[in-house]
Amino acid sequence: MAEINHLIPHFLHFEAGVPVDDLTRPLEEQFATARRRGWSDDPDDPGGKTMIGVTLDTYRTYCRRKGYPVPTPQRLRDMTFATWRDILKTLYWDRMGADGIHSQGIANICVDWLWASGPGMTKRIQRILGVKADGIVGPKTLAAINAADPTDLFTRLYNARVSYYKGCKAWWKYSKGWMRRLDAIKPDGSFTIYGERIVPRTQ
């Protein structure tokens, strides 16, 4: 089964510029590096204030779901690895039912799409699979994922993401970064960054 910790180094590199040489270090150490690099408030980015890929709106959604106080931008900047990882798991990994996906590569490309483009991407994924596009990943969606040939499904998901990105207004500005991130994800669950194959550790 897919494992969430295998995906984390990919996120820390592309959201916060953690160097390739550091991506096989313990995850807590990678996150410490990411915290020093991961703050963004780009006026062209509709996400606004963002810490290691987590927008303030996303953090508010997470805190509301958990019953936590309404977060401030400073709390967003100060979030711990445990909180950041739980946001990834609660709002994206679990939304995709990724603990039930057999292929790490398929889990990676799906969850990364939800993270990058919003939870609504579950419906696009379901359309690719030919199941009811209700945005709820249940037993039928997971069965379709796991019954598909992983290489073929990965290719279809990859092509769908490229098509989606080309339709985004910000394609002109972010296309190179978006494609570099997508191209790093490999069907076997590894990542290739600057020509180097990365096999993530699990802790």
Each predicted region: which residue ranges?
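Cell-wall polysaccharide-cleaving catalytic domain and substrate-binding groove, primarily
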Residues: 1-203
